[in-house]
């Protein structure tokens, strides 16, 4: 059943509240928003179109770094209207990033932000992050994923790779990344002012 949920976007869409489901189904069916401005996925004005909260998690779980082929760990920093801002880090702790997603679309984009590729979901059909904010990200991510998967699909499924990374990798947010988070947060908040 989990593989079916990972693959079937209609099933994913049907798992949403009816009001949200309607917005998703009636959203633009595109890989990139036609009025997007800036670097795809990296600019708040050019977010990645996905199908709902589960679509965000599935899309981000399939992203891998182009240069090292590593999956990303992620959590949601916040949201404004239909725009969600996620912090990501490669599972080896070397590549930190911020990505923007727009969740009211009938399917997930097949396009990737610069520096990333999409993995085949069949290779590891697991979620590598959460739509919650994790205070000491990525430490504590495993339990947040467990809560998220139990809530969304009824089964707590934290990937063992997340636990292994939490135990063996020394994650340290670079100061310039911390600055980017502050700037991006202020920018996103300014979009609705």
Which sequence ranges carry the predicted segments?
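N-terminal secretory-pathway/extracellular module detecting exported/lumenal segments
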Residues: 2-83, 90-193
